[in-house]
């Protein structure tokens, strides 16, 4: 029997050393006992596998009727979203037969050559754009990129796919960052896995010495953190 998507993705996070345990200060200022380091996906094999996971999640949501079948382009916000968007578009085409473009933004407008703020598939009115990003903390990146997209063309943003949903409430409410973005922009947000699924799987996945990656101590620290900040 094939393991679930969230279980296989957790294995990948652990094998890639992208899931770290300890004490980490997040952008929000919160002290977290775990951290997802997207910088660990730093070679061709890892980024190809990561794109395959994103593509699998996207196809799963299309088949469930939660996303439309006709995605025109996958958009990854600069800088971390660029390899995510490109690798996801490649995987959607090569593994799932979908003809889909990729697009990303420039941080600074180019004043020579083709110019403009966008690279890749150029945006046009009516296009269906699917966003990809790594981990959402407060939704800042989404709020920055939506106006950029709308300034280019009257596109339809059909959804956002994350690698991990941290399932945390925002600073000023008990609503999760994911739910806040969904309510504000009107499109669905999906994640390959959420932190509860990851810690559940991590207790069953073993190190080379036979011990679980997620020990009772690590799980207790994560539970305490989510008790305080979880949504």
UniProtKB/Swiss-Prot annotation:
Q: Which SUPFAM superfamilies match?
A: PRTase-like
Keywords attached to this Swiss-Prot or TrEMBL record, sorted alphabetically, are: Glycosyltransferase, Magnesium, Pyrimidine biosynthesis, Transferase
**GO biological processes:** 'de novo' pyrimidine nucleobase biosynthetic process; 'de novo' UMP biosynthetic process; pyrimidine ribonucleoside biosynthetic process
The EC designation for this entry is 2.4.2.10
Instruction: Tell me its cofactors.
Output: Mg(2+)
> Which Gene Ontology molecular function entries are recorded, alphabetically?
magnesium ion binding; orotate phosphoribosyltransferase activity
Task: Name the Pfam families for this protein.
Answer: Pribosyltran
Gene Ontology CC annotations of this record: cytoplasm
Q: Which CDD domains match?
A: PRTases_typeI (cd06223)
Q: Which residues bind orotate per the record? A: 137, 166
Annotated positions binding 5-phospho-alpha-D-ribose 1-diphosphate: 27, 79-80, 106-107, 110, 112, 133-141
Reading the lineage from the top rank, the first entry is Bacteria
Q: What is catalysed by this protein?
A: orotidine 5'-phosphate + diphosphate = orotate + 5-phospho-alpha-D-ribose 1-diphosphate
Alphabetized InterPro entries for the sequence:
OPRT, Or_phspho_trans_dom, PRibTrfase_dom, PRTase-like
Q: In which pathway does it act?
A: Pyrimidine metabolism; UMP biosynthesis via de novo pathway; UMP from orotate: step 1/2
Job of this protein: Catalyzes the transfer of a ribosyl phosphate group from 5-phosphoribose 1-diphosphate to orotate, leading to the formation of orotidine monophosphate (OMP).
* Subunit and partners: Homodimer.
| Family per record | Belongs to the purine/pyrimidine phosphoribosyltransferase family. PyrE subfamily.
Indicate what this protein is called per its UniProt record: Orotate phosphoribosyltransferase
* Originating species: Bifidobacterium adolescentis (strain ATCC 15703 / DSM 20083 / NCTC 11814 / E194a)
């Amino acid at each position: 029997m094939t393991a679930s998507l969230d279980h296989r993705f957790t294995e990948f996070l652990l094998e890639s050393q992208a899931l770290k345990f300890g004490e980490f200060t997040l952008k929000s200022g919160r002290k977290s006992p775990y951290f997802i380091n997207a910088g660990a996906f730093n070679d061709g094999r890892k980024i190809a596998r990561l794109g395959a996971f994103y593509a699998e999640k996207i196809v799963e949501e299309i088949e469930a009727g939660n996303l439309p079948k006709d995605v025109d382009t996958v958009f990854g916000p600069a800088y971390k979203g660029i390899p995510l968007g490109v690798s996801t578009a490649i995987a959607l085409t090569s593994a799932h037969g979908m003809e889909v473009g990729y697009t990303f933004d420039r941080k600074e407008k180019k004043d020579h050559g083709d110019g403009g703020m966008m690279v890749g598939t150029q945006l046009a009115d009516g296009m269906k754009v699917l966003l990809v990003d790594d981990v959402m903390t407060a939704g800042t990146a989404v709020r920055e990129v939506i106006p950029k997209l709308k300034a280019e063309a009257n596109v339809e943003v059909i959804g956002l796919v994350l690698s991990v949903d941290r399932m945390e409430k925002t600073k000023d409410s008990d609503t999760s960052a994911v739910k806040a973005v969904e309510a504000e922009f009107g499109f669905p947000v999906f994640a390959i896995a959420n932190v509860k699924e990851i810690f559940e799987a991590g207790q069953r996945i073993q190190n080379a010495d036979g011990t679980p990656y997620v020990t009772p101590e690590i799980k207790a620290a994560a539970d305490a953190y989510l008790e305080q900040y979880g949504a």
